[in-house]
């Protein structure tokens, strides 16, 4: 029996000469095929024989049932009687089969041949579903075996079908048969020897012949294992595959194969292969084939000889006369009998001989020594283990070997190999590929697919249009011909958290994700900013891989299963962010951490709580060693508006929490003010003097008040800004730092007015997610039009939904330097989903936050070119000035842009502080008088008109003084446990507002052994022998009415 050995280290050649990702099962889940591999082979084989057809869309309905008419058609075709069916179209055999029915001729012929039989009422019931019992009965009759069947139907027919290997284990004979099962039974029947009547008259006799449906009726030449045995030959006499498209492109077509079969009676012939057969799978092997005799002979089935051993593995070690052989320059033909190859995974060795055929990277070598010299040299020089397909002869020696360099990267050797590379962009029209490193592969331009080049995806024939961004690809050359190219791509991607990083040597790092380990070699690439910058991993950059422990990554694997490209889940500007200190550091005695607040370049204010060992100075030394005094941090980590303003780099861990802080040392620090700054800053060319402003430059608006009254300094209202806004002002005082690339590292705006940043206004369409970020789509003003735009959020869309922001609400928002909506700054200007009124407008605080100068509500009574006359709640008429650039939003009917307003519309009119002039910029239509009458919304309309923006306290708003959850630590001293917890007041709560602090342990109020309240930080301790089940800290406001609680969970220190 043939053995096919697939090494786990092989290139997943899987009976193919095409390299493909062996680790495909380790990739992200993909859609399963609708047919398994065996079923697909069966269907394609039957289709090539003209017996079955699909629905024209790649579907064959293998899980559907089949009618009696359809099944009769199949059997008639299998008997080669299709032409007779055309002549029998107008016979009247059954009462319910009309001559106009497409199946009439097939049913009539099947009946005439006694393959099918009707019912006592002379009907055929063509639309009835065929049962398993009926199906095997018709097939047994078609094969001529009905005279040999004895017993009661249907068991007798089922037994005969099992005996003939047509169908086994039919347990539900009266159930409707599926098309897939019918196809399998018919396929099994094709090779069954036919039974025919050989004597007639009174002495009727039947005999089993040497003919089959294939050979007698379908005109198919069969050369398979049975043929070899019956003809007195052996498997060596089966045809040998001597040329396939991946090697002989140009000499044979993409759908052809050349066979050498003198003993098989087919000579050296090139055949067309049916759809679904990948001839490249069988190069160098003896094969079994069915060849349909037609105008153009077509191979409808092909499989390897079951007596030939084919091994899929990787090249290990070459030995010559028992010694390791790595210098092949003196190798000669006389050495072949003593040359052995040990395969990498199986560790078995096989000997070459003078008849061994050698192919290397799809190039055939007439002299095997020439090919082996190249293979041995390249394999040794690169430290690779190339993929190999090995075919053994009857003496267990290598008859054929195809070695593929599926591991080298960035190779550009025309006629040999290009790649591997990672696809960044595909131009299907020009057949051009842009790589992740921005290099381009243009050699396919002007070439004809299928004639001048072939494409394979995961080892199977594909189209150039199937190639996508993120795939790893290499290009080889058919038989070394520079004009005949082979593009091999894989789409194996592994995503998950790195559990472990292991280094075997300076050129072998391994990443463990789940229960799988993946190897990274020098030459692979890395990106942690969404592939804006792609870094080669070389001897100077292994730290990029070494630092991936506990990170979520995407690994793009090459054909051998090695890592070709690494992407972190989050971009570097999400994980490593420049920041400024906004609240001074203080030492937390209960956690041994330094706690302070920062504002990141993304506009997020974050509380940092880190041990000294995770805080690094300008020289990369942490404050827990290297003679560093961590007490200095109290004087260093403070907010400032001077030239000594500290720029930090905060690294977030996989959970988005600060895990490391580094001080960024500037090369230069400069300061300019007023007109001098305005002249220096060029927003058009993105320059500050001679220094370039890049997309990585951090811009901070630090014009808020620096409070120094308490021990902990705090910078109020710190925000981020855009360079174009900062560069366009002439009343600012600005500090900027420069790095060693003459780029502006950071800009600190420390004094000045008018830098609030323009507010955006828009009508909410929906929320979504793209590129790993939550998004919001809005209709917003663009000049005098309303356009649809999608923004990424800098936070969670659920935070907006929690504020009851929904579709059709009108909001004000700002975007940060990355054009992401700052979630914390979103203001719901008009709540269209409010209960009890047509729409609810924001209060004075909301107007201030949204930078709205004026906002009114009203019922439109008249409209002129530049004036809207409206009525208020008291039916007083008022006028509102509008302009040509005023835009109109429909918040209740058609949504989005409105053409204007009409008498009877209920409106909200807004004058934005960001747009010059006092005329109204936005008119929002929330309903109309007709709708109010129809839906009986008079009360809602009255409530709407009574609104006047004012500061209104929310009676349901609770005093939010503490975080909801706090983690404390406990230690044991004999039977006594010492519980300690620290909690910081929320940023908007002042320490002087707190009147009382209480501690509850296991549901009871207790007196803490330690209670310290300083600079807004509460430290509390309690000693007891009891085990904690629940605990909380409660604070009460000085008004005596408001209180807040924090649940404390204790973990062992």
UniProtKB/Swiss-Prot annotation:
GO annotations of cellular component type:
extracellular region; S-layer
Domain named SLH is located at 26-89, 90-153, 154-203
Q: Where in the cell is it found?
A: Secreted, Cell wall, S-layer
In the UniProt record, the signal sequence range is 1-23
For this protein, the record's Pfam families field holds: SLH
Q: Which UniProt keywords apply?
A: Cell wall, Repeat, S-layer, Secreted, Signal
Q: Does the keyword rRNA-binding apply?
A: no
List, alphabetically, the InterPro entries matched: SLH_dom
Q: Where along the sequence do coiled-coil regions lie?
A: none
Subunit-structure text: The middle cell wall layer is composed of subunits of the middle cell wall protein. These proteins form a hexagonal array with a lattice constant of 14.5 nM in the middle cell wall layers.
Q: What does this protein do?
A: The middle wall protein binds to peptidoglycan and to the outer cell wall protein.
What name appears for this protein in its UniProt entry? Middle cell wall protein
From what organism does this protein derive? Answer: Brevibacillus brevis (strain 47 / JCM 6285 / NBRC 100599)
């Amino acid at each position: 029996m043939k053995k096919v050995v697939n090494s786990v280290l092989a290139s997943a050649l899987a009976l193919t000469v095409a390299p493909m990702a062996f680790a495909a099962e380790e990739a992200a889940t993909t859609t399963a095929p609708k047919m398994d591999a065996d079923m697909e082979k069966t269907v394609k084989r039957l289709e090539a024989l003209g017996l079955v057809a699909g629905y024209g869309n790649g579907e064959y309905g293998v899980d559907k049932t089949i009618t009696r008419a359809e099944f009769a058609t199949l059997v008639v075709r299998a008997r080669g009687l299709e032409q007779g069916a055309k002549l029998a179209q107008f016979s009247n055999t059954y009462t319910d089969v009309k001559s106009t029915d497409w199946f009439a001729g097939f049913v009539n012929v099947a009946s005439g041949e006694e393959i099918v039989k009707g019912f006592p009422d002379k009907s055929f019931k063509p639309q009835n579903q065929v049962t398993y019992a009926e199906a095997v009965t018709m097939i047994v009759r078609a094969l001529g075996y009905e005279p040999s069947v004895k017993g009661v139907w249907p068991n007798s027919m089922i037994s005969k079908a099992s005996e003939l290997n047509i169908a086994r284990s039919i347990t539900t004979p009266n159930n409707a048969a599926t098309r897939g099962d019918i196809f399998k039974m018919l396929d099994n029947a094709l090779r069954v020897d036919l039974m025919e009547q050989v004597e007639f008259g009174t002495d009727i006799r039947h005999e089993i012949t040497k003919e089959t449906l294939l050979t007698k009726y379908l005109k198919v030449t069969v050369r398979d294992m049975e043929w070899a045995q019956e003809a007195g030959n052996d498997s060596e006499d089966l045809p040998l595959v001597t040329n396939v498209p991946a090697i002989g492109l140009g000499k044979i077509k993409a759908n052809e194969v050349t066979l050498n079969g003198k003993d098989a009676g087919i000579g050296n012939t090139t055949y067309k292969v049916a759809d679904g057969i990948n001839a490249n799978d069988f190069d160098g092997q003896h094969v079994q084939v069915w060849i349909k005799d037609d105008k153009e002979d077509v191979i409808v089935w092909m499989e390897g000889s079951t007596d030939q051993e084919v091994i899929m593995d990787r090249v290990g070690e070459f030995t010559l006369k028992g010694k390791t052989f790595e210098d092949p320059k003196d190798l000669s033909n006389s050495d072949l009998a003593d040359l052995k190859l040990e395969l990498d995974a199986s560790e078995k060795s096989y000997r070459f001989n003078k008849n061994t055929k050698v192919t290397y990277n799809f190039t055939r070598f007439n002299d095997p020594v020439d090919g082996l010299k190249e293979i041995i040299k390249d394999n040794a020089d690169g430290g690779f283990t190339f993929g190999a397909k090995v075919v053994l002869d009857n003496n267990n020696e290598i008859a054929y070997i195809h070695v593929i360099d599926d591991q080298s990267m960035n190779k550009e050797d025309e006629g040999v190999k290009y790649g591997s590379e990672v696809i960044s962009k595909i131009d299907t029209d020009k057949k051009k590929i842009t790589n992740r490193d921005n290099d381009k592969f243009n050699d396919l331009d002007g070439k004809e697919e299928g004639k001048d080049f072939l494409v394979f995806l995961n080892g199977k024939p594909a189209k150039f249009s199937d190639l996508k961004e993120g795939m790893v690809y290499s290009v080889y050359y058919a038989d070394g011909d520079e004009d005949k190219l082979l593009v091999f791509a894989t789409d194996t991607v592994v995503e998950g958290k790195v559990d472990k990083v292991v280094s075997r040597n300076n050129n072998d790092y391994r990443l463990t994700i789940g229960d799988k380990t993946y190897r990274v070699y020098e030459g692979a690439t890395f990106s942690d900013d969404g592939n804006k910058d792609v870094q080669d991993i070389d001897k100077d950059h292994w730290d990029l891989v070494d630092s991936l422990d506990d990170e979520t990554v995407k690994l793009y694997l090459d054909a051998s299963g090695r890592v070709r490209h690494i992407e972190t889940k989050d971009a570097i500007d999400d994980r490593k962010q420049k920041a400024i200190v906004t609240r001074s550091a203080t030492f937390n005695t209960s956690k041994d951490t330094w706690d302070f607040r920062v504002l990141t370049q993304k506009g997020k204010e974050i509380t940092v709580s880190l041990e000294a060992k995770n805080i690094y100075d300008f020289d990369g030394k942490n404050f827990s060693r290297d003679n560093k005094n961590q007490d200095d941090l109290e004087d260093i980590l403070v907010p400032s508006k001077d030239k000594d303003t500290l720029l930090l780099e905060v690294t977030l861990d996989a959970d988005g929490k600060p895990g490391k802080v580094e001080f960024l040392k500037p090369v230069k620090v400069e300061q300019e003010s007023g007109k001098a700054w305005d002249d220096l800053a060029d927003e058009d060319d993105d320059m500050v003097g001679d220094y370039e402003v890049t997309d990585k430059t951090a811009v901070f608006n630090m014009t808020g008040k620096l409070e120094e009254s308490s021990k902990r300094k705090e910078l109020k209202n710190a925000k981020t800004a855009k360079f174009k806004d900062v560069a366009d002002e002439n009343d600012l005082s600005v500090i900027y730092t420069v790095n060693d690339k003459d780029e502006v590292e950071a800009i600190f705006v420390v004094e000045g007015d008018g830098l609030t940043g323009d507010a955006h206004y828009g009508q909410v369409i929906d929320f979504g997610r793209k590129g790993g970020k939550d998004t919001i789509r809005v209709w917003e003003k663009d000049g005098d039009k309303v356009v649809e735009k999608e923004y990424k959020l800098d936070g969670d869309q659920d935070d907006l939904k929690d504020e009851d922001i929904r579709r059709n609400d009108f909001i004000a928002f700002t975007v940060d330097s990355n054009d992401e909506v700052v979630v914390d700054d979103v203001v719901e200007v008009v709540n269209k989903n409010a209960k009890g009124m047509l729409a609810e407008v924001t209060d004075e605080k909301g107007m201030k936050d949204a930078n709205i100068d004026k906002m009114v509500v009203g019922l439109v009574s008249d409209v002129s070119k530049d004036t809207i006359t409206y009525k208020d709640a008291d039916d007083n008429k008022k006028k509102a000035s509008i302009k040509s650039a005023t835009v109109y939003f429909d918040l209740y009917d058609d949504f989005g842009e409105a053409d204007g307003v009409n008498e009877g519309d209920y409106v909200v009119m807004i004058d934005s502080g960001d747009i010059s002039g006092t005329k109204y910029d936005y008119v929002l239509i929330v309903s109309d008088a007709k709708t109010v009458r129809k839906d009986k919304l008079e009360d809602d309309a009255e409530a709407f008109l009574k609104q006047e923006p004012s500061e209104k306290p929310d009676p349901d708003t609770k005093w939010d003084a503490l975080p909801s959850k706090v983690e404390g630590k406990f230690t044991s001293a004999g039977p006594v446990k010492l519980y300690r917890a620290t909690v910081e007041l929320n940023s908007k709560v002042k320490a002087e507002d707190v009147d009382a602090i209480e501690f509850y342990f296991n549901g009871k109020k207790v007196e803490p052994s330690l209670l310290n309240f300083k600079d807004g930080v509460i430290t509390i301790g309690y000693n007891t022998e009891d085990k904690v089940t629940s605990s909380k800290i409660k604070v009460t406001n000085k008004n005596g009415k408001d209180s807040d609680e924090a649940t404390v969970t204790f973990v062992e220190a």
